[in-house]
């Protein structure tokens, strides 16, 4: 038996479909897209992937499609997995993985790629997968975009990213001549969709013992040979074939997984599959991009698979106007609801509304909730020969099991289980919140009066105040209750005419930051947030702090591309700038023209500006590969001397554009090229003394000298990491993080007026340590929770509900799991050594 389990489907915070195929013995395969949030969905649903060995990527490979893959690979490696194969139909895959070389590094896992030609078959003892590569505009399949030399370079880089043995304790990929290499140029965007046919090895028929004995076969080794499908000859010369003593083989239905990115692919798909042999086809999964129109043209293609097989094929459709916008992360949503019951104006109810395809739902007579928004693509009803019972909506709970059947004797066995459950905030409130008996928390106050309320920047008073949204507040990797870190700070500015202009600044953006924004806000509010987004700041290169930035940049461009005067400042360690350039050349070059990049190092509060290393040119890298290992290890990269000169002109322009008085960084005590920062904003054009200073620690040990007493001193707001509880000081020292008390100590020495503590270890996912902390000298402080919206003027209001917070999470504590905070190769080495000792 084989089970197909949807891991994600198109929702606000999981944009694409991902399918897990699992055998009866536990072998696992992924098919589809590894979008941001995929790993968190596995955690939410307690799905283990220790037996995962193959990932078959479908469709195109934009960041939206595979933004969750880097984090997924890191986690799989940290779990001790020794091998993983990525399958795809174009060698752009190696380029993609190579772009991650400055921030994805794990030893002990053998990561391989398998570039599949059109109609090539990959086979193991369980499964056979045939690829179908469809070019956007038709034509002959072009397997690759690189020549043999370039392919060799890319493969070498990927191999060095995943070495067999651990490097020295201090390792900087940007100083490794095998990683800091110029990547090959891309001439054009790769527009190919990879699709798959899945078939399973048949089940051998039962051995008919009595029949074998009748034929004179003695018990023993000859029975075994016949069972294995071997023909035997008896002593009397009689030949006995397996067919004489075995029941008929049992087969499984075939499955197609088709990924159509947009309407321009449709004709090529029709051409590719018009003569497809539908015999034994039991299910077709359609992974439809947002730009695919639900109309007759689409269903004319789908009808192809009904020919000579009418009524026998099931069709499972994934599309953002068909699949429900269900809550993907219920644990997180329930946490938000409980916190909202305590501070109703500090949280938005997660959005579950969606505009559905009226064409689809009318044609297949599928019910929707009252008041659902719908849209039509054509005037006439959908024209298709598919019956209602054979069309299915792809969603997280819609599992399919395939069981073996005897061909020509019984029908294919394809069992579809699971329906979308009705979702009601009111019912969830009654079940999980009402029993807590919070004062003033009733269903009208928390739910009914808040269904369409946006609590961010929603009053005349708030429009004049600094506001903070702690989008993600966890460390290392996404958990059930906290996503990885990201903070949005809105700083208003009053111009000479008294008009208020917002400056939104994003401080770090871990994986699926955009998904959180989409779940929190309406489309109109999202547009406003991104039109006001002026800067993205990245503190360091650990993946949990930046895997969401590309999605944020794409979303910013979506709402600002028509305004040619609009730019976004991106302030990051220099290596991340290289990644952005390499990635956006692949996906959307136009965004690069609208990014103004400045290195974190150019804001350093020091006379010494550290130089970045120069990348090795491709031609020179070829010579390095020919050298022996001793020569390789002794080779040093050259420094880029120009990089030590601050980009003063661009910094001045940023100061002017964003009305900034000072922007300073200091080196964080964490990993190489890690920073803390302080930004002083002007607040009123008519009052030069009206300023607001915000400081952000990033990840660091307490840095009193440089951060508290120098760049951050007298901050109006300090946002500081508080990764570990106070009793875990030894862990904090080892991992170069802060305990809660240490973070408070930094604030006290800084003389910060207000303090927000964030970036909590996922070992304590719901509630940080509220008591036994040292005194906070700041006027007000609070602990950050995911999706929390807080007015700077009211940061201290959370302290009033501290006594109720422990009560709020009694239910969750009963099922709490201890998740290790693994951030570095050294953490993994320690774990492996302990394991060997045991």
UniProtKB/Swiss-Prot annotation:
It is an enzyme of class 3 (hydrolase). It is found in: Cytoplasm; Nucleus. The keyword Zinc applies. It comes from the Eukaryota. One of its GO terms (biological process) is mitochondrial tRNA 3'-end processing. It catalyses: Endonucleolytic cleavage of RNA, removing extra 3' nucleotides from tRNA precursor, generating 3' termini of tRNAs. A 3'-hydroxy group is left at the tRNA terminus and a 5'-phosphoryl group is left at the trailer molecule. Its EC number is 3.1.26.11. GO terms for molecular function: 3'-tRNA processing endoribonuclease activity; metal ion binding. Its main location: cytoplasm. Keywords: Cytoplasm, Endonuclease, Hydrolase, Metal-binding, Nuclease, Nucleus, Phosphoprotein, tRNA processing, Zinc. CDD domains: RNaseZ_ELAC1_ELAC2-C-term-like_MBL-fold. Its cofactor is Zn(2+). Coiled coil: none annotated. The modification Phosphoserine is found at residue 824. GO terms for cellular component: cytoplasm; mitochondrion; nucleus. Homodimer. Zinc phosphodiesterase, which displays some tRNA 3'-processing endonuclease activity. Probably involved in tRNA maturation, by removing a 3'-trailer from precursor tRNA. PANTHER family: ZINC PHOSPHODIESTERASE ELAC PROTEIN 2. Belongs to the RNase Z family. Present with 2710 molecules/cell in log phase SD medium. This is Ribonuclease Z.
